[in-house]
Amino acid sequence: MSGSSSRRKGARAEQAVARMLRAWGWAARTSRSVQGVQGGADLITDCPLSIEVKDHQRVELAAWLDQAVRQAEPGRPGVVFAKKRGKGNPEDWYAVMRVADLLALLKDVR
């Protein structure tokens, strides 16, 4: 896949996740839509997560999660939303994060 078509595929996945978050009541937009934003999470949102969106044929969870954690905003755990083949709705995709970050989030719902 060429670089430009790969970027378009990634942009579509990010837009789909942003729409899903908005449907759930979070403010969300792609960081690509904000001029001059480089690095950091793929989405700008008031959701308490720092989200990295992936739509790739080959799954590279360790590298993706390392990237999400490295680029996470302070106080927001990094999480990867990875598109599941054949599933257009992001609610059916995979969400991957470190166990420690998940437990920290769950601690607040006890």
Predicted region positions:
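Catalytic phosphate/metal-binding cores of nucleic-acid and nucleotide-processing enzymes, i.e., regions
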Residues: M1-R110
